[in-house]
């Protein structure tokens, strides 16, 4: 099984960026869960990016948008795009390796 942890407000990217917006529809330990299209501030390129989905996942939406998971992308000015790093280890999706 592959574990992909949910991304929450304040999570970092591989380029040192920070998730700066998230849904208030659900939270983990009181911290809002980030969704596809939420904003990420990237200091590496000095731009504001957005979360884009990447990789295998179970379909799960809040407010009509897919939840963000660890290793999803930050679409900003960086090339290649930075990856999101989960800042919590409480909640994740378990994906069968055969599906990946």
Show which residues each predicted segment covers.
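Intrinsically disordered, low-complexity proline/glycine-rich segments
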Residues: 1-100
């Amino acid at each position: 099984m592959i574990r992909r942890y949910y991304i929450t407000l304040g999570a970092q990217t591989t380029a040192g960026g920070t998730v700066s917006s998230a849904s208030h529809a659900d939270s983990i330990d009181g911290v809002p869960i980030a969704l596809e299209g939420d904003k990420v501030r990237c200091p590496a390129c000095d731009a504001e990016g957005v979360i884009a989905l990447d990789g295998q996942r179970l379909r799960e939406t809040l407010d009509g948008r897919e939840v963000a998971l660890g290793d999803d992308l930050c679409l900003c000015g960086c090339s290649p795009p930075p990856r999101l790093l989960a800042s919590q280890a409480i909640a994740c999706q378990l994906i069968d390796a055969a599906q990946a």
